[in-house]
Each structure stands twice: as C-alpha cells, then as structure tokens.
C-alpha cells in the first residue's frame, strides 16, 4: 500500500474514534417503537432496545408516562428467574451509560401484568458496571410462586453503579437488592408499600425496602439518603453478607405493617447483619462489620436498629430511634448457633432513643464500646428535647436534587440534653462536643 492510502485509512480511523467520543443521546417513551431510531422525535419503546444502541458515555432519556410491561417484554428466563429488563452492557470509568428521566418528567414502569408462572420476577437486573439509573418509578412487581421466594425491583450484580432517585412502591417485591458487585451507590431512593400476599404464609416475610447480601469481594457498597416505609418485612436488611456495607442518612419507618398498621412480617428498621444458622466454620472470614450512621428509625413493628445475632459486632453511630418496640436491640448468639446472648463487640456512639417500648436490649456493654448515647447514661430523652414530633414529616417530598426533606421532626430543641452529649469522632460538630442523635443542632442538616 502506498503512503497516501495508508494516511487516508489512518485519518478515517481517527475520525471514527473522535466521533465516538462525542456522547450520543437516545430517547425512550411509552408511545415509542423499538423499530424507531431512538431520537426525541421517534423514540424507542423499551429500555432493553435502548441498551443495544447505547455505548459508554451515552445517555438514554426516559420520557414521562406509564410504561406497561408485559410478559413478552421479558429479556431472559434462567432457571427460576425472569429478568424483564436486563442491563448487561457496561459503561467505562468516567463514561457511564446513563438511563435517566427527562428533566421535569416522571417515567413509571408498571410490572403488574408480568406474571410468569413459577418464576421470580426481577424487574431490572443490573449485571453491567458503570451504569447510572436515575429518576424513575417501578410499581406493581409481582410474585407468582407459592413457596419460599422473592421478587426484586432493582437487582444489582455489577460494580460502580449509581442507583439514584428511584421510587419503588406498591408491589410485591424488594426495592433495591445488591447480591454482588463492588462500589455501588444507592442514593436518595424510596421503597414503600411493598407486600407479598402470595408466597409462604402471606405475611410478606421476604419483602424488604433495601437489601444487601453481597458475596466475597462485594466491597464499598453504600445506601445513602434512602427511605423505606410500609414494607412488609424490614426497611434495610443486611443478613448473610460476606462483606461490609454502609447505610448513612437513611430513614426506616412503619416497616412490618400495611398502611392501615396491620402487622405483617419481621418489621425491623435496620437489620444490620446476622448469618441466620450458618455454622461458624462456614462464616465469612473476617466477619463483615456493617456501619449504620446518621439514620432514623421510627415506629417499626419490632426493632429500630437490630444486630440480628451478628457475630463480631456492628457500628451504630449518630442514629435516632423513636417509638419502635425496641429502639436498639444488639442481640447476639453463641458459636453453637442456638444460644441467644447479649451482643458483644459492638460500637455504639452518640445514639439517641426516645419513647420506645424498650430503649436498649441485649447488649453486653462490658464487651462492647459504648459512649455518648442517651441510654446507659444519667439522662433519658423526653418530648421536650425535640423541636417537632409530627410523623407526617417522614413522608414529605424530597428536595429538588432528591435530598431528604429538612423538617423539624426529631431535631433537637434549644436546651435539649442531647446537645453536646456525644463524644468527638471524625466528623464536624457545633459546640463543645457532638450532639447525640442523627441531627446536629445548628447545622440545618
């Protein structure tokens, strides 16, 4: 080949590479067609079709309206699973593939008609990495199996994904469930009014708002700014995890109940660990140490913050519990898998409990590190310690960027004994010492 053709081929390759660096935009709409080009004027109909077109750095805009999924939309069946939308194409570091709501619009994905017999329905299964899902709702996810089972709205198996400002509600499924993958962030999401009346005894014993059950290597996963309420089992459930997870600035309330406060399943706000009856020889090494901080648990059926027999201890830091049956329950077990004992090895700093049926249960304080809390001290919180106690504040709308609503609920009143009652840790504080509880007075946070 002569020099000129070689230069032309090289220039053509460079041009194609440069064009691909310019991120593309695709559109999906309820009235769209998967035979369309995916433009704003001629959008796709399904997220699954948009994935085939998208490449790292691209954005898929989801237009407002209701997407009514059918069984024909199931992307893959595998063993007992039906993956309706399967996101298995990855972005790249710094160039995620984004599936986001069009500004000012609300896409709603309705799975109430997806009822494959004897299958676990996973509405969105995310096995890809470097993806960003933002700003849509998932409703009506079904359960079709009578025995022990679960369905899932957002099933995360990849890494470096962001799940942001999703509302997962009024179905029979877990909201967000992380089973594998590392460094995923679940940010400012809501999971509520989810209950499975079909499987087992009909109490909905597997329907949590948010679940983390990561395999070995699934490190660095975080739930931040999320709310879970009226889920028939737990708000947040971290049982049977091989790696540690963090929940911070999260709220869990009314779990274990239906909206009319009929009792359903377990009803813990934060079930922060445990490995059920797993023999000690089969426990992960090291046993993960979960962290729950700056979080709120209100009026859950059972416990607000619960260690669930977790060996090795859990970190509960700067949390507020109100009106739970037990506000803080640190129950442990012996290595015989049978004997319940007060939990050991826990770290409890600057927590605040108020008006629980019991403030603190099952803690071996001598074998744990405990400081700056309202329990095991010389004072107990009363209503006078708080600016507001209006439970309606828990479900107020989020801020313009998806942030939790700033209200007077459980904020510390001037002169509260919780002010400056904590011990200094790593974070900033106002006054002589940090406050006890989830909210630092004088910061607006």
Residue ranges and their predicted role:
Residues 9-20:
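Bacterial N-terminal signal peptides
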Residues 1-11:
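Bacterial N-terminal signal peptides that target proteins for export
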């Amino acid at each position: 080949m002569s020099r000129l053709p070689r230069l032309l081929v090289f220039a053509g390759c460079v041009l194609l590479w440069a064009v691909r660096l310019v991120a593309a935009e695709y559109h999906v709409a309820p009235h769209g067609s998967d035979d369309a080009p995916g433009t704003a004027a001629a959008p796709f109909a399904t997220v699954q079709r948009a994935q085939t077109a998208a490449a790292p750095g691209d954005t898929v805009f989801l237009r407002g309206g209701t997407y009514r999924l059918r069984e024909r939309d199931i992307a893959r069946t595998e063993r007992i699973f039906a993956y309706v939308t399967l996101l298995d194409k990855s972005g790249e570091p710094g160039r995620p593939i984004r599936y986001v709501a069009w500004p000012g619009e609300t896409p709603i994905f309705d799975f109430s008609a997806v009822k494959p017999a004897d299958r676990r329905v996973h509405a969105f299964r995310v096995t890809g990495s470097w993806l960003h899902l933002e700003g849509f709702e998932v409703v009506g996810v079904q359960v079709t199996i009578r025995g022990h089972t679960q369905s899932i709205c957002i099933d995360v198996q990849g890494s470096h994904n962001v799940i942001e400002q999703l509302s997962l509600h009024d179905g029979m499924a877990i909201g967000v469930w992380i089973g594998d993958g590392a460094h995923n962030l679940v940010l400012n999401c809501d999971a509520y009014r989810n209950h499975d009346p079909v499987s087992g005894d009909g109490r909905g014993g597997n329907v949590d708002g948010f679940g983390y059950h990561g395999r070995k290597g699934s490190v660095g996963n975080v739930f931040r700014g999320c709310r879970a309420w009226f889920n028939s089992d737990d708000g947040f459930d971290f049982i049977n995890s091989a790696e540690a997870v963090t929940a911070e600035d999260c709220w869990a309330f009314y779990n274990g109940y239906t909206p009319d406060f009929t009792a359903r399943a377990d009803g813990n706000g934060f079930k922060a660990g445990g490995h059920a009856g797993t023999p000690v020889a089969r426990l992960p090494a090291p046993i993960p140490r979960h962290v729950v901080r700056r979080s709120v648990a209100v009026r859950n059926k059972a416990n607000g913050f619960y260690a669930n027999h977790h060996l090795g201890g859990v970190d509960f830091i700067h949390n507020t519990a109100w009106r739970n049956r037990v506000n803080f329950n640190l129950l442990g077990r012996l290595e015989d898998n049978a004997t319940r004992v007060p939990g050991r090895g826990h770290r409890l700093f600057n927590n605040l409990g108020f008006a629980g049926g019991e403030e603190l249960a099952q803690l071996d304080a001598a074998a744990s590190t405990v400081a700056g809390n309202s329990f095991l001290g010389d004072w107990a919180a009363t209503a006078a310690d708080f600016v507001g106690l209006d439970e309606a504040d828990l479900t107020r709308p989020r801020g313009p960027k998806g942030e939790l609503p700033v209200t007077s609920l459980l904020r510390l009143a001037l002169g509260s004994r919780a002010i400056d009652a904590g011990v200094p840790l790593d974070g900033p504080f106002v006054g002589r010492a940090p406050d006890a509880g989830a909210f630092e007075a004088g910061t607006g946070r």
